[in-house]
């Protein structure tokens, strides 16, 4: 299986499977001289790790990241400085229960990658889905922690804005609320609604989809290039690479199709300091594939988890009709833990374009 690497100058390769002994990543192209501590990476993995509420999988993983290369340790024994060589990171798997998947070893779960993996490669890791499992994304979050260090002054934050048909009230948006509830919701009022709704989904052994919004602030103007190297193109590509993602939009996205040209175009005025001021941000901070200096806004839709307790019609590897019912521990709404994953992907895209711009134009330091 090829294509386990993304990025141009800031390149990330992930490896490992859901039920293997460990998984991890190699970050190549990280500039030398970046100083950080392990806790600067661990904080993002802690947001993503399973078992933190009844609304996510009860698989218990500490997701403790280890940095194996690419850094030098300071005298304090904690602070690391990047050397410019590949940064390799490892996360051990400690709570696999492969026996839960014995009954579906030759069955294809509807909506899952089981069938297509077997079709393409003639073999698949049925234990938790192998590489197709969202477990793989822990390594991406670790890489995103490094990416956040690359671009000075950039803040990347995400939030869950919709579960099923239940959407947040954007008038209640408060970033301080995001880490105060199990859903990463910026709207405190929607939390009890989601709790009741997901409790019903969970008890029925079913699952539901969600929408996540990621906003990057402090992005320098001028990142990205026309046509085949657009910043929004690469953000969309990386978000689409996340397991279970079925749609991505930048700025107003699909809503722009219902908007007039007068309302959609972001009007501009010159500020007192000589810096242009945008009067709105329908473009999501990107015009012509190049960042405007406004916040970069992306949303992505995550489908319902395919592994559910409800019995469904399918086939097996022998071509027989079967009824599939998945046991094991699964997310009733995988979109919850997709919030830090989406943040990581946007951070990696911005870091890559920052380094590419610096190398091509020399205008950024």
Curated annotation (Swiss-Prot):
What does the record give as its pathway?
Metabolic intermediate biosynthesis; chorismate biosynthesis; chorismate from D-erythrose 4-phosphate and phosphoenolpyruvate: step 7/7
GO cellular component, as recorded: cytosol
Residue numbers binding NADP(+): 48, 54
Write out the residues that bind FMN: 131-133, 243-244, 288, 303-307, 329
What Enzyme Commission number(s) appear in the record? 4.2.3.5
Top EC class, one word? lyase
Catalytic reactions of this protein: 5-O-(1-carboxyvinyl)-3-phosphoshikimate = chorismate + phosphate
Signal peptide segment: none
Q: What CDD domains has UniProt attached to this entry?
A: Chorismate_synthase
The alphabetized UniProt keywords are: Amino-acid biosynthesis, Aromatic amino acid biosynthesis, FAD, Flavoprotein, FMN, Lyase, NADP
- GO terms for biological process? amino acid biosynthetic process; aromatic amino acid family biosynthetic process; chorismate biosynthetic process
Entry's cofactor comment: Reduced FMN (FMNH(2)).
Q: Which cofactor does it need?
A: FMNH2
InterPro entries from the entry?
Answer: Chorismate_synth, Chorismate_synth_AroC_sf, Chorismate_synthase_CS
Molecular function via GO:
chorismate synthase activity; FMN binding
Q: What does this protein do?
A: This reaction introduces a second double bond into the aromatic ring system.
Quaternary structure, per UniProt, is: Homotetramer.
Family statement drawn from the similarity comment of this UniProt entry: Belongs to the chorismate synthase family.
Q: What is this protein called?
A: Chorismate synthase
């Amino acid at each position: 299986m090829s294509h386990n690497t993304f990025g141009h100058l800031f390149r990330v390769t992930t490896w490992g499977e859901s039920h293997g002994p460990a998984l991890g990543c190699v970050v190549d192209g990280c500039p030398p001289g970046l100083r950080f501590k392990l806790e600067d990476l661990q904080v993002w993995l802690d947001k993503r790790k399973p078992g933190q509420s009844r609304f996510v999988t009860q698989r218990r993983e500490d997701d403790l990241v280890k940095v194996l290369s690419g850094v030098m340790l300071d005298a304090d024994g904690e602070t690391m400085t990047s050397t410019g060589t590949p940064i390799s990171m490892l996360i051990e798997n400690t709570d696999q229960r492969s026996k839960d998947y014995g009954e579906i070893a030759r069955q294809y779960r509807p909506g899952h990658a089981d069938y297509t993996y077997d079709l393409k490669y003639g073999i698949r890791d049925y234990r938790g889905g192998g590489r197709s499992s969202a477990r793989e994304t822990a390594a991406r979050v670790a890489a995103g922690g490094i990416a956040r260090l690359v671009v000075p002054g950039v803040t990347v934050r995400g939030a869950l804005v919709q579960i099923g048909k239940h959407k947040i009230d954007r008038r209640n948006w408060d970033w301080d609320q995001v880490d105060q509830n199990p859903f990463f919701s910026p709207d405190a009022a929607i939390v009890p609604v989601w709790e009741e709704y997901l409790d019903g989904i969970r008890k029925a052994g079913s699952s539901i989809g969600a929408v996540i919004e990621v906003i990057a602030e402090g992005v320098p103007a001028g990142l990205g290039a026309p046509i085949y190297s657009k910043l929004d193109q690469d953000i969309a590509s990386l978000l689409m690479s996340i397991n279970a993602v079925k749609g991505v939009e930048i700025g107003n996205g699909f809503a722009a199709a219902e908007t007039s040209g007068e309302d959609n175009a972001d009007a501009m005025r010159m500020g007192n300091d000589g810096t242009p001021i945008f009067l709105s941000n329908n473009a999501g901070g990107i015009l012509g594939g190049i960042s405007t200096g406004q916040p970069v806004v992306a949303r992505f839709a995550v489908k319902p988890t395919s592994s559910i307790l409800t019995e469904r019609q399918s086939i097996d590897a022998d071509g027989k009709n079967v009824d599939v019912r998945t046991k094991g521990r699964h997310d009733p709404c995988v979109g919850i833990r997709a919030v830090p994953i989406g943040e990581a992907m946007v951070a990696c895209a911005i870091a890559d374009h920052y380094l590419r711009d610096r190398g091509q134009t020399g205008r950024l330091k």
